[in-house]
Structure formats: structure tokens, C-alpha cells
Regions:
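Short hydrophobic beta-strand element within catalytic cores of glycosyltransferases
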Residues: 132-135
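Short alpha-helical donor nucleotide-sugar binding micro-motif in glycosyltransferases
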Residues: 102-107
Length: 213
């Protein structure tokens, strides 16, 4: 039984410089929505930008920060989104680590529509900083948010609706997500590395599991 001899250990995320948000931190009049993933098609940024554009057309108040690594010569959908969202865009493009950590502490909502997400380091960083997640109910995300799935995950086709609900009443959604930021810090490298060390030490002492090759 291969499954019985296997154990998946998550990657560690460096959260040492990610700020911790106070549980009684005030909710801003204009919340900031953060998109902080790699600028590539598998992250499905167009779906996020379309949702934000529709909510902007409805007159819902929010600001947008679009950050992440970009190796594309012509990220057309990003350029169009910046033009459409106009003055709502408060940050656009790559940030060095100190500036990025500062932004994490100021953002209010982190959003994703990714088609492929094997873990989700950027999302973990944002949740650890106190951002309320708006994530699809697939990929790695259910495993990240655990007991907060009803708060953090939206169903297929439900991005715009969930994002609207969150932006209209962010304090209520934050109240439902209390504890998620602390829970996600279980992926901090300083926590994960002790599990790595324990398992490698047992393997060195006891040898591989029976039947392993």
C-alpha cells in the first residue's frame, strides 16, 4: 500500500516579515483588493479583472493592488484592467520584499481565480497578514483554509457575487473569518521545518518504511 507509506509535508513559507493584524483593526471606508500572483494565464487574471470591472460599474467602493512577477512582454489583460479601473488602482507591478510586506499589511481582501495552484504561497502570505480570502473552491485552496471554507471559498461562477458580498459588508465577513490568519501561519517555515527535521531524523534512524524502494 503506497499511500500508507507516504506523507505529504507542505512547503514552508517565510512569514517572518508578514505583519500580524489586530483582531480589532478598523475596517477602512474603501477596502483594498489585492491580486498578488504570477502574471500568467494559468492564474486566470482576466476573470478577476472582469469581476472587479463589473463591481466598479455598479459603483461599489474599493481600491485595487495588482502585484506579482511578470516575465511577459505584453501582458495585455493587465494593461486593459489598469485602464478600466483607473484611479482605483493604488499599486501596479512588482514590489521589492519590504514594500510588498507593507502592502500585505494594508490590503483587506485577497482574490484568486487560478486554474492551477499547487500550493499558494502568495495567498498564504496575504491571509497571514489578515486579508480576507476570496478563492475558488478547488486547487489547493480547500486544504489551506480548512474549517473556514464557507467564508473563504466561492463556487464555480460565483466570483463576482462573493466579491460583491464581501465588499458591501466586510466587517461581517471578517468576523466570520476570525482565527484564519493564525491558522494559516502553520505553514510558516519555522513551524514546518521542525516537521521536516523530525521525519528526516526518524528516516535516518529507522530506515525507509517496509516495502519502500
Amino acid at each position: 500500500d503506497v499511500a500508507g507509506r507516504c506523507h505529504v509535508v507542505p512547503v514552508g513559507v517565510d512569514l517572518a516579515d508578514v505583519p500580524v493584524r489586530s483582531v480589532d483593526a478598523p475596517t477602512p471606508d474603501v477596502p483594498t483588493v489585492l491580486w498578488n500572483q504570477r502574471w500568467d494565464h494559468d492564474k486566470n487574471p482576466t476573470a478577476v479583472f472582469n469581476a472587479l470591472g463589473r463591481l466598479a460599474d455598479e459603483g461599489i467602493g474599493f481600491a485595487v493592488a495588482v502585484v506579482g512577477e511578470n516575465e511577459r512582454v505584453d501582458p495585455r489583460e493587465f494593461t486593459l484592467a489598469r485602464e478600466r479601473l483607473g484611479d482605483r488602482v493604488v499599486q501596479f507591478g512588482f514590489l521589492d520584499r519590504p514594500a510588498y510586506a507593507d502592502l500585505l499589511g494594508r490590503a483587506d481582501v485577497v482574490v484568486s481565480a487560478a486554474h492551477h495552484e499547487f500550493f499558494g504561497i502568495a495567498v498564504v502570505e496575504a491571509i497571514a497578514a489578515g486579508c480576507l480570502p476570496v478563492l475558488p473552491a478547488h486547487q489547493s485552496y480547500p486544504g489551506l483554509v480548512g474549517d473556514w471554507a464557507d467564508v473563504a471559498l466561492y463556487p464555480d461562477g460565483g466570483l463576482t457575487t462573493r466579491l460583491r458580498d464581501v465588499l458591501v459588508d466586510l466587517p461581517a465577513w471578517r468576523a466570520r473569518a476570525v482565527g484564519l490568519d493564525a491558522s494559516i501561519r502553520r505553514f510558516d517555515w519555522l513551524t514546518v521545518v521542525s516537521d521536516y527535521d523530525d521525519r528526516l531524523e526518524r528516516l535516518a534512524v529507522d530506515g525507509p518504511p517496509l516495502g519502500a524502494h
